[in-house]
From Swiss-Prot:
Region feature (Disordered): 17-105
Lipidation (S-diacylglycerol cysteine): C18
Signal sequence coordinates: 1-17
Localization in the cell: Cell membrane
Major localization listed first in the record, in broad terms: membrane
Name by which UniProt lists this protein: Uncharacterized lipoprotein SAB2248c
Membrane topology: Lipid-anchor
Positions with biased composition (Low complexity): 71-105
């Protein structure tokens, strides 16, 4: 009987030990599974972070490419604008030059004598040279006449009337010679010259005819 009790006690201890070993094995296996899951989760997290970083780097590269393309587009646009501005400036200059030429042509007045002109400077300074060559060197006739008239009016009467003109040549340089009648003094004229630079000068304010 004592042996039976002893045997049962030993069997109970053995089974208890086996059960404890089984629980320990289960706990060990659970820890291994948890560790493996944690490592897998960490690996997934690392992979996800790496993917995000790669995507972020790709995004930076795309943004850099976009900035480079934008800079190139802006530079091309600037160059295009500069070219267009230069072309517009050239066109404006050409237009201005054409306008100036047209104004010159439209304002050109052929030399003429005053109404009922007496031969005053034509007798004093008869011109037998090349009139076309002289007129090419001299300023616009009407401009020169107006300048000479203003100069003549500075002496004596200030409402002198244009009479006649001639051309004088000296060492290849030409000048207009104008006469202006003083309506308040019978037979008196002012003689005024205008050189090729447009400078007007009274040479005789009281020429008597």
């Amino acid at each position: 009987m004592k042996r039976l009790v002893t045997g049962l006690l030993a069997l109970s201890l053995f089974l208890a030990a086996c059960g404890q070993d089984s629980d320990q094995q289960k706990d060990s296996n659970k820890e291994k599974d948890d560790k493996a899951k944690t490592e897998q989760q960490d690996e997934k997290t690392n992979d996800s972070s790496k993917d995000k970083k790669d995507k972020k780097d790709d995004s930076k590269d795309v943004n850099k490419d976009n900035k480079d393309n934008s800079a190139n587009d802006n530079q091309q646009q600037s160059n295009s604008n500069a070219t267009n501005n230069d072309q517009n400036q050239t066109n404006n200059n050409q237009s201005s030059n054409n306008q100036a030429n047209n104004n010159q042509k439209s304002s050109y007045v052929a030399p003429y004598y005053g109404q009922n002109a007496a031969p005053v400077v034509r007798q004093i300074y008869p011109f037998n040279g090349n009139k076309t060559q002289a007129l090419q060197q001299l300023p616009n006739f009407q401009t020169a006449l107006n300048s000479a008239n203003n100069e003549a009016n500075k002496f004596g009467s200030n409402n002198k009337v244009y009479n006649d003109y001639s051309i004088e040549e000296h060492n290849g340089n030409y000048k207009y010679v104008f006469s202006f009648k003083d309506p308040n003094a019978n037979g008196k004229y002012s003689i005024v010259t205008v050189d090729y630079t447009g400078q007007a000068m009274v040479t005789d304010p009281n020429y008597q005819q």
